[in-house]
Amino acid sequence: MSRAIIENAGEHRVSILINGMYSIENINDVKMAYRDLLTDEDMFIFSAVAPTAYCNIDNHGRSKAAQAARDIAIANIAPDIVYVISFFEGHGDSYTVSIPADDVPWKTVCVCHDLIPLLNKERYLGDPNFREFYMNKLAEFERADAIFAISQSAAQEVIEYTDIPSDRVLNISSAVGEDFAVIDYSAEHIQSLKDKYRLPDEFILTLAMIEPRKNIEAPIHAYSMLPAELQQRYPMVLAYKVHPEGLERILRLAESYGLSRSQLIFTGFLTDDDLIALYNLCKLFVFPSLHEGFGLPPLEAMRCGAATLGSNITSLPEVIGWEDAMFNPHDVQDIRRVMEKALTDEAFYRELKAHALTQSAKFSWANTAHLAIDGFTRLLQSSKEVDAGQTEGVTTSRIQTMQKIDALSEVDRLGLAWAVARNGYKQHTRKLLVDISVLAKHDAKTGIQRVSRSILSELLKSGVPGYEVSAVYYTPGECYRYANQYLSSNFPGEYGADEPVLFSKDDILIATDLTAHLFPEVVTQIDCMRAAGAFACFVVHDILPLRRPEWSIEGIQREFPIWLSCLAEHADRLICVSASVAEDVKAWIAENSHWVKPNPLLTVSNFHLGADLDASVPSTGMPDNAQALLATMAAAPSFIMVGTMEPRKGHAQTLAAFEELWCEGKNYNLFIVGKQGWNVDSLCEKLRHHPQLNKKLFWLQNISDEFLVELYARSRALIFASQGEGFGLPLIEAAQKKLPVIIRDIPVFKEIAQEHAWYFSGEAPADIAKAVEDWLALYEQNAHPRSENINWLTWKQSAELLLKNLPIIAPAAKQ
């Protein structure tokens, strides 16, 4: 119904309000159901403190407070109408709806599905707690500005059994989904269904709902009265799962009517697709209910072309629409009579089949939506102008209500204070929060931290219209806090203390650091921020520890599967630093679908990193021997490698290649720029004692960005021998300086450099040695690939591209 209203709303704006006390999985499902119809801006989540289920008396204070918190959220959305599709809920869970007793600046319209508990108090309201809950809800229900009933029968019940006047009650009918339809199944599919559910070629279908008003005993009794040849030809199939006690009771009942157990077939659990198939395949569908608000099963069956028989009381005549197809559900002889006629009178049976399609076509969600929208329009036309000041008054009065609830603990009150703040949507400026949880604690000056530093710098400098840009960090055992002390130390201006972050609707967390060590603990924080309406987005630099675990330390090998699975299941967006990484991430999630259950809202995209050292908050300073080193570079062809030394980076292979070249008498220099990393102890020891060290081999650690620029400018070419990268910043930095590049032929380098680099393959030293010689030959002829033709971005452009991958809402769109 709600989707149809949105689809047919025309000039009217529709928003949805989601209960933030529900699990993040439920919230995901709701947002997923509407994402093709509504923008994120029109999906609101209200915060409150759970549990609120009325069945536990200890929850009653929180329940009242949750209703007040919801009112504050609604007041900040400022709708004309609040449409409550299901009102009598919340006894067994934290479902929260209410109709204010005071004057509020919106109209409340409730859907009435039925008043069955009210009309059958002995059966349904025997429990004092549930009776109190239901009657309290009924009193609220009567305060609604309008009631939309799903049938004329339900509307009449409202008029007769409540104090709601008839001019406030409207029948909007109901419908079923488009999935319920006549389907021409293949013979193979039909046979598989028969095998799965032990179905005969022809059968009578009814629903095995073990609930008194569903009257399951009556069709079984009537079936037992059919002629033996009809019973033999048409076994009775009872759809849906029945608990063992109920099953045994039905079987004993059938035996008391003279039926054998084999004449009844129980399907057990049915998927929607299989139920639709059974509707299509059955000879006859029988629905003997004693009381319905509408009666979806007969409509479902008729939409599938089934010859349908049903009760002639409450709402079912409206649905079935033909007196001859109905029976008195209290009279088994009447049920038998109509069933037998349908099974023996071919003309009547053909009429039943034809009527099913004609009658079911009268019901659609579009029709229901139009009736509802017309009802909304009439309600608003009869309403007086709303005083804008009433919105603020609602917030004030609801806070006062919360303050007077004695049953709330101090923890409850603190949670409600946060909830009230989150629900004040109007008061918020949206926030773009850059997660620098690693950088804020220690800047190790790795490539990833250079990315974090550069992106943060650009976002702070350029700003994002409609958003406050801040840096945040997470400390295990605490909450997210603003990284104001870090900003004060590294950027102009004063930023204050590291206060806790209040995440609210449309805020965006973008984690540019690699924070695998924080998972899975930080997941609770991520779920909480998303349950407040914020978005959790993460930059993924690579997943090499998952693809090539031998390249990583054991701790990283353990952390990465946890990290990426948590991101897949709990993040909104994964923004990878290259298309290659994005494809790898999507492939890994698919490969591990047996245990990784991704958030249905998750998107995986990519952007490219920047490379202008001047804009990355570069470090400065020149070593004492800088001029001597630069002179050495100029004296002979010099090749440079840049990056932390790790097994995958190819330093050992490159060194061995140059050793071969030196043995051949080649006068080439190799400059290795990068500190010692993991599992390269023997290589580093070899470097420290190498006979060519500081002659033709140079190892420079912890140099400044300023000196690196000078080295780039004087090198003949960059050698990037890495066997795996997420992006490869040195490649872009070299291209920016027009430094030619000799690189390994791997997908991500092909994506970035395309034909503008000299590629090599293989893991033997001779492979790199040959690549260097071949490249030099081209270089001497001025025919080598030109790295300046590689497309690269400034950090400003990279940050802008990152923003395009975030759920940014333009300022003009904010109401």
Swiss-Prot record:
Q: Which InterPro entries did the record assign?
A: Glyco_trans_1
Please state where this protein is localized.
Answer: Cell inner membrane
What SUPFAM superfamilies does the annotation carry?
UDP-Glycosyltransferase/glycogen phosphorylase (SSF53756)
Q: Which domain of life is it from?
A: Bacteria
Q: Which family does the record assign?
A: Belongs to the glycosyltransferase group 1 family. Glycosyltransferase 4 subfamily.
The job of this chain, per UniProt, is described as: Mannosyltransferase involved in the biosynthesis of the repeat unit of the lipopolysaccharide (LPS) O-antigen region.
The protein's name? Serotype-specific mannosyltransferase WbdA
